[in-house]
Amino acid sequence: MTASIGKTNLLGLTQPEMEKFFDSIGEKRFRAGQVMKWIHHFGVDDFDAMTNVGKALREKLKAVAEIRGPEVVSEDISSDGTRKWVVRVASGSCVETVYIPQGKRGTLCVSSQAGCALDCSFCSTGKQGFNSNLTAAEVIGQVWIANKSFGSVPATVDRAITNVVMMGMGEPLLNFDNVIAAMHLMMDDLGYGISKRRVTLSTSGVVPMIDELAKHIDVSLALSLHAPNDALRNQLVPINKKYPLKMLLESCQRYMSALGEKRVLTIEYTLLKDVNDKLEHAVEMIELLKDVPCKINLIPFNPFPHSGYERPSNNAIRRFQDQLHHAGFNVTVRTTRGEDIDAACGQLVGQVLDRTRRSERYIAVRELSADADMPQSAATRT
């Protein structure tokens, strides 16, 4: 949908922002709740469809505001029920959103940026450079689009989307304000009413923003670890050179402590053949995380062209898992979903208009991890 010049896009406004908007046009604040319900509960993008809003106000809204989500380029459905949407954002780039059904739970994986500046060596999103931050409307718009696609009207009844993970393209903490606003809308009863424990933000480790996070929102936290020591993580996740593991894990523990509840950090660990999948790496990981309340998601690498990495054997994956399991950690191995529509872990596709490497376009890849309440193995740490 093309932007209308000078009009306010209501899709990305939080409740306080929506109330300020209605103040600014001389209307009462209760109108904010009315309009938000139409937008998020019923997926409406036409003011004339808002039957409990008077005609005069509808005409005023049409003159000064719009409800505009990202443009849906394509929607694919896998044989296992996984869905993938390619959406075009205002920068001209396309990003992807993936829905993973599992029993009564449905998890939506949402992107926060077009491209990424972190340049993780096993992720081709980083190879294409950073293009743009998504607006709050473009972030929450992915939930809005998916919800409408499922016909979940109102959004809070018999919902298809029970969990949202900020694990798509980009580093969410480098688009802090827009991601925070979108997550508030995910949890707001006037938005999508999703429990705070079912909204997960995944980060590669932007320490100052992890410390800032607890001041603004209470959601589950996942850490893209991928290596058990600084030397290896410096190679795989270059931001580690700025924020090494000790500093990073301390910031994660500060975040969890600040929430004042017993929380568990989700650790994401992509297994790369002969790189970080040896038993010695598992032993290092046990030592590194021994004092961190956490659960561990092991993600076997899904190769993409020219990645330079391979998926470990099933035996290697099982040995690594068993080593952690025997040390008392909750450990799961990610099951490949949506492979036939390129929606599996490490297969997300997005055409990004690259401002930092204009001569190349790459298939965008960002690991897709489980939602915050993914069932765990029987082992429990004491």
UniProtKB/Swiss-Prot annotation:
Active site positions: 96, 345
Protein's UniProt keywords contain Cytoplasm: yes
Biological processes per GO annotation: rRNA base methylation; tRNA methylation
Positions that bind [4Fe-4S] cluster: 116, 120, 123
Alphabetized Pfam families for the sequence: Radical_SAM (PF04055), RlmN_N (PF21016)
GO cellular component, one term: cytoplasm
E.C. number: 2.1.1.192
CDD domains: Radical_SAM (cd01335)
An annotated Gene Ontology molecular function: tRNA (adenine(37)-C2)-methyltransferase activity
Cofactor note: Binds 1 [4Fe-4S] cluster. The cluster is coordinated with 3 cysteines and an exchangeable S-adenosyl-L-methionine.
Subcellular location: Cytoplasm
Stretches assigned to the Radical SAM core domain: 102-342
Alphabetical list of PROSITE patterns matching this protein: RADICAL_SAM
Cofactors demanded by this protein: [4Fe-4S] cluster
Catalysed reactions, as listed in the record: adenosine(2503) in 23S rRNA + 2 reduced [2Fe-2S]-[ferredoxin] + 2 S-adenosyl-L-methionine = 2-methyladenosine(2503) in 23S rRNA + 5'-deoxyadenosine + L-methionine + 2 oxidized [2Fe-2S]-[ferredoxin] + S-adenosyl-L-homocysteine; adenosine(37) in tRNA + 2 reduced [2Fe-2S]-[ferredoxin] + 2 S-adenosyl-L-methionine = 2-methyladenosine(37) in tRNA + 5'-deoxyadenosine + L-methionine + 2 oxidized [2Fe-2S]-[ferredoxin] + S-adenosyl-L-homocysteine
Domain of life the protein comes from: Bacteria
SS bond list: 109-345
Main location group: cytoplasm
UniProt: S-adenosyl-L-methionine binding residues: 170-171, 202, 224-226, 302
Keywords carried by this UniProt record: 4Fe-4S, Cytoplasm, Disulfide bond, Iron, Iron-sulfur, Metal-binding, Methyltransferase, rRNA processing, S-adenosyl-L-methionine, Transferase, tRNA processing
Miscellaneous information on this protein: Reaction proceeds by a ping-pong mechanism involving intermediate methylation of a conserved cysteine residue.
Similarity comment text for this entry: Belongs to the radical SAM superfamily. RlmN family.
Known role: Specifically methylates position 2 of adenine 2503 in 23S rRNA and position 2 of adenine 37 in tRNAs. m2A2503 modification seems to play a crucial role in the proofreading step occurring at the peptidyl transferase center and thus would serve to optimize ribosomal fidelity.
This protein's name: Dual-specificity RNA methyltransferase RlmN
Organism listed in the record: Pseudomonas fluorescens (strain ATCC BAA-477 / NRRL B-23932 / Pf-5)
Gene: rlmN
